[in-house]
């Protein structure tokens, strides 16, 4: 044999030598022979993913701003690693994130940081994604979400009551909104909630588990083993990787218990739950005979549940917190919103609907600005056109090339949103009056056939949550600045420069 007569040190040296030769050959290929070799961008970024690894892992999720610098130097299209391109052009966003008329796959790096391989959001191939999405789409339509509004109002009643009880004290609005969104989304998925709003200081294990996953997001994208392999390691080993990682396992076990509780119910009770007006997604999916058996496996249902729940908690809670920060930070905006909402004031015992609130121009402007400045997913989510070459700015992008844009860069593009860092609801009011379709550039929920599944549920929580909290409670900011809601790191979601980015407020009492 070739290495039979080599000593162990010599064999190790030979292995390292072979690896070094491979690395050199790969670098030469990436720079001089790769199909993307002629695209603009720094040469160091074109070599494998070393440059991206440095900024996202070593420098804690800051590659986004390095990409921004690349665009400033090289133009609207740049090569950001050996096989991927990034474009900054708000007009081209819908071409990359295409609708159902063109087949678009998701690139592996977009999901390799997640630990839910059987979920719709982690599905790479276009046709399988379309089938999985079709199963749950009906339960996230506007009509379906309208049936959930009574639950949203009931949870808001409890939230506002708890905040009012804190009169004279400081509350963490971000945690409070997180508990609210968690209750709503778990109810919609499982048909029940755990009353996270009732938890001490609005803190609960599910949110802690999400934080653990997000803190590991950038690293797991580059690991040579799937994240699920790590998640399935024994708890003592997981504890060594991250002392809080067992929280993730505990959260999955809690979700598993909820699924198994349903499976153990008598058929008559399952049928009654299926026929209920506000049925949960998982119950309906399990009960629907049209759903293939392979889409009803326990792992599939757990992964689907966890992604919908995790995605629906943090992004909406952050958006609510961003909205309240700007309202409390600018009393003129808050007073104008309250005045506008007085035009559709309800008598005792009646509540606003999302549709009614959407029809109030200034209310809509507040919601859209909060969404714009909360950004949604700030990480790149590359798309692949598997069979069709894309054309952009004189370049032909080969089929199979991962291409992405950044919601953060689009939402801060001054050519679309002048003074982009200013919270200005009037920009949406004026755009509507002028006949300008500013919604075309609202990309926080992404676009196309893979746009956010829960967009209608998110809007319902935002409209109802902002309107009711802003008109019910008298509060003032406490030790919270713009830096606390700013984006300085990307770990799947947006993270501040330091701390947890919480918006804190002192409760003065109920509005008179």
UniProtKB/Swiss-Prot annotation:
It is a single-pass membrane protein. It is found in: Membrane. Pathway: Secondary metabolite biosynthesis; terpenoid biosynthesis. One of its GO terms (biological process) is mycotoxin biosynthetic process. Its cofactor is heme. It holds the Pfam family p450. It is an enzyme of class 1 (oxidoreductase). This is Cytochrome P450 monooxygenase pbrB. It comes from Penicillium brasilianum.
């Amino acid at each position: 044999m070739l290495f039979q007569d080599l000593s162990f040190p010599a064999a190790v040296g030979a292995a390292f030598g072979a690896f070094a030769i491979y690395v050199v050959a790969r670098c030469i290929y990436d720079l001089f022979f790769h199909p993307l070799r002629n695209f603009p961008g720094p040469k160091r970024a074109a070599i494998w993913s070393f440059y991206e690894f440095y900024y996202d892992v070593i420098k804690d999720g800051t590659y986004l701003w390095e990409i921004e610098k690349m665009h400033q130097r090289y133009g609207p299209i740049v090569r950001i690693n050996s096989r991927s391109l990034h474009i900054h052009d708000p007009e081209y966003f819908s071409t990359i994130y295409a609708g159902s008329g063109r087949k678009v796959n998701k690139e592996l790096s977009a999901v390799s940081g997640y630990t839910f391989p059987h979920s719709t959001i982690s599905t790479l191939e276009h046709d399988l994604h379309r089938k999985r999405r079709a199963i749950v789409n009906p339960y996230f339509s506007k009509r379906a979400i309208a049936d959930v509004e009574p639950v949203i109002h009931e949870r808001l009643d409890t939230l506002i009551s708890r905040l009012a009880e804190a009169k004279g004290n400081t509350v963490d609005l971000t945690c409070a909104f997180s508990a609210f969104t968690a209750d709503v989304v778990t109810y919609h998925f499982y048909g029940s909630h755990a009353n996270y709003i009732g938890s001490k200081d609005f803190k609960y294990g599910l949110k802690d588990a999400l934080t653990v996953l997000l803190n590991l997001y950038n690293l797991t994208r580059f690991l040579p083993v799937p994240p699920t392999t790590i998640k399935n390691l024994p708890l003592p080993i997981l504890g060594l990787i991250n002392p809080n990682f067992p929280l993730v396992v505990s959260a999955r076990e809690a979700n598993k218990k909820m699924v198994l509780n349903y499976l153990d119910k008598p058929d008559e009770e399952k049928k009654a739950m299926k026929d209920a007006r506000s049925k949960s997604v998982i119950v309906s999916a399990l009960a629907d005979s049209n759903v293939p058996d392979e889409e009803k496996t326990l792992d599939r249902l757990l992964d689907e549940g966890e992604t919908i729940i995790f995605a629906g908690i943090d992004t909406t809670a952050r958006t609510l917190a961003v909205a309240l920060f700007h309202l409390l930070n600018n009393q003129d905006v808050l007073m104008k919103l309250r005045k506008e909402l007085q035009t559709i004031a309800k008598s005792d015992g009646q509540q606003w609907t999302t549709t009614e609130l959407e029809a109030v121009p200034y209310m809509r402007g507040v919601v859209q600005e909060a969404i714009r400045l909360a950004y949604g997913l700030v990480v790149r989510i590359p798309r692949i056109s598997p069979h069709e070459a894309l054309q952009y700015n004189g370049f032909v992008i080969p089929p199979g090339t991962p291409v992405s844009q950044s919601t953060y860069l689009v939402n801060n593009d001054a050519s679309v949103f002048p003074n982009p860092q200013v919270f200005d609801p009037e920009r949406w009011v004026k755009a509507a009056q002028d006949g300008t379709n500013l919604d075309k550039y609202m990309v926080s929920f992404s676009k196309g056939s893979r746009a956010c599944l829960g967009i209608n549920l998110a809007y319902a929580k935002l409209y109802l949550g902002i309107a009711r909290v802003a008109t019910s409670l008298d509060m003032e900011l406490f030790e919270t600045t713009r830096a606390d809601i700013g984006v300085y790191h990307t770990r799947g979601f947006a993270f501040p420069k330091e701390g947890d980015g919480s918006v804190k407020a002192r409760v003065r009492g109920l509005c008179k």
